Amino acid sequence: MQELYKELLKDVKGVTLHEQPADPRYDSNFWLCAATLDPAVRIKGQENAYKEVIKTAVGGAAGVIKAVDSATTDCQPNENVEALRVFMLGKKVECRPVWKPMHKQPVYKDAPAYVNGVSESIFKVGFCLPAGPYVSDDDVRYIVECIKEAIV
């Protein structure tokens, strides 16, 4: 699946598929197919990216919700990554940002953290592509076509 994503995305400017280092000590099974989206890439609907999310509640652990008046936080994906997620959802494809850095998770807000900015940088531009045993080659082709369609 990773190789098919790699082949189909190779000419899509601004989308970079995560690859393992050329070092033989690494041997990824690519259970997660992740990519980054260049901040300069524009996505259809990007100007409304954070207007599309639910603004009345932000999910928490075990279904706990907290009323909010803003759909944004101090650490969130770039607008184009969120716009791509929303666009893909409209195409019945679920993709998501990469995981929010642990030190930015509410449960760890008061915990000590040793950071250098890398995790926040990756979170702003990273997204996960559908992957798994039930994602077919035809599914991957459809997913990539949707990504191409989303880019303005």
Enumerate the predicted regions with their spans.
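PLP-dependent aminotransferase class I/II
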Residues: M1-V152
